[in-house]
Curated annotation (Swiss-Prot):
Single GO molecular function: tRNA methyltransferase activity
Enzyme class: transferase
Keywords: Cytoplasm, Methyltransferase, S-adenosyl-L-methionine, Transferase, tRNA processing
One Pfam family linked to the record: TYW2_N_2
Gene: taw21
GO biological process, one term: tRNA N1-guanine methylation
EC number(s) stated in the UniProt entry for this protein: 2.1.1.-
Main subcellular localisation: cytoplasm
Name of the protein in question: tRNA 4-demethylwyosine(37)-methyltransferase Taw21
Length: 262
């Protein structure tokens, strides 16, 4: 893949958007291009790298209740289901049916390495399971309650629990804002849905133990010269750490803040 990237140095808006998901390559479609403009590159990827079986284009939009991007098949097998390897884990998923972002890989590891043995954890928006399963594998908590409203995410999460033998993870299908009240209070709550950060924060404060930790992912819009991390940390009481997860556009960011409940 590095060879192809070097060949695309003059098209930085394309090569910076390439993600490898198992045996599938996803190319983010730049604002100034159409999916069909990427077909030649997609075919070159297939001919250069035999392990790549399919190439897809992804529009930048994230829509609907399940936060799904719009994908366009470009070349190779018309298949979007694959096994994705990240850190010590394997995940079976269909990226057209569940939220997927390789950019969250660092966050999955950062959170998981903070988990302590026998913790009670609630993941409010679990998706196909990367936060929950890696936390179980590395931290050996007592239990990770993993909630998601997307039936496909719930299905893949159950498969991935078995695939990784992460039996501390308990998949729960439904609305986190309702199902969370059926659960015991947690030592740690993960809330990785930036669009619903304010509501998630208020609910998490009710269900986290005193001295417990909330990992809250939020959207921040800035004016020129403003620090999105500082804005987020000032907004959410108890914040002691923050970092930019990704830039959505020049004035909007996804930021994570770690919060200690008092």
């Amino acid at each position: 893949m590095k060879t192809l990237i070097k060949r695309l140095q003059d098209q930085q808006d394309i090569w910076k958007r390439i993600e490898i998901v198992g045996d599938i390559v996803i190319i983010g479609v730049p604002f100034n291009k159409k999916p069909e403009d990427l077909v030649e590159i997609a075919n070159e990827i297939l001919s250069t790298f035999p392990y790549v079986k399919s190439v897809w284009g992804r529009h930048r939009d994230v829509n609907g209740t399940y936060r799904l991007s719009t994908y366009v098949h470009l070349a190779g097998e018309k298949r979007s289901e694959t096994v994705y390897k990240e850190h010590k884990c394997k995940y079976f998923l269909d990226f057209t049916k569940v939220f997927f972002s390789e950019k969250l890989s660092y966050e999955h590891l950062r959170v998981a390495t903070q988990v302590k043995r026998d913790e009670i954890i609630i993941n409010m928006f679990s998706g196909f399971g990367p936060f929950s399963i890696l936390s179980a594998v590395l931290g050996r908590p007592k239990i990770v309650y993993s909630i998601d409203l997307n039936p496909y995410a719930y299905y893949y999460m159950m498969v991935n629990v078995e695939l990784n033998k992460a039996y501390e993870v308990l998949p729960i299908y439904g609305d986190a804002f309702k199902r969370i009240y059926e659960l015991e209070d947690a030592d740690r709550i993960i809330a990785p849905l930036p669009e619903l950060a304010d509501k998630a924060y208020e609910v998490a404060l009710q269900k986290v133990k005193k001295g417990g930790i909330i990992h809250l992912y939020t959207e921040v819009e800035t004016n020129k010269g403003e620090d999105p991390v500082r804005i987020a940390m000032n907004k959410y009481r108890g914040s002691y750490f923050g970092r930019i997860v990704r830039s959505v556009n020049p004035h909007k960011y996804h930021v994570v803040v770690d919060i200690k409940a008092n």
